Amino acid sequence: MSDYTIAAVDDVPDVLGDYPGEMRMFTGSIGAEQVAFTYRRMPAQTGGKGGYGHAHRTQEEIYFVISGTLQFKLGDDVVDVGPKTAVRIAPPTVRSVWNEGPDDAELVICSVRLEDQVDEHEMHEGFWPQ
């Protein structure tokens, strides 16, 4: 018997609450044991600019922009990333993502799945001033 799971975006809870856009963490919903997989929709003028950034202790991430153009602040660099483009970010690199607009942007974030996320994340308040 084959072992697989299928889930549509609307099958996975949006963890952003009242914050504009969507962030849907598929990992648990599909029972992924090794891969962390997150879908995010970012309306114009949303993201981490004017706020925080984050880094990881051990977890490498790959961000894949599906549609729109996003600004990534990666350490001291700010780069524009368009559709159908992947960005690999090493664990200690502080990062944040911003959608300047005018349209919504969609992206997927992939990494290795970790059981203990609490000690993995390092928040950096004021990382990307406006």
Task: Explain the meaning of each model-derived region.
Residues 1-37, 43-44, 52, 120-130:
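A short, N-terminal "cap"/entry segment at the start of jelly-roll beta-barrel domains
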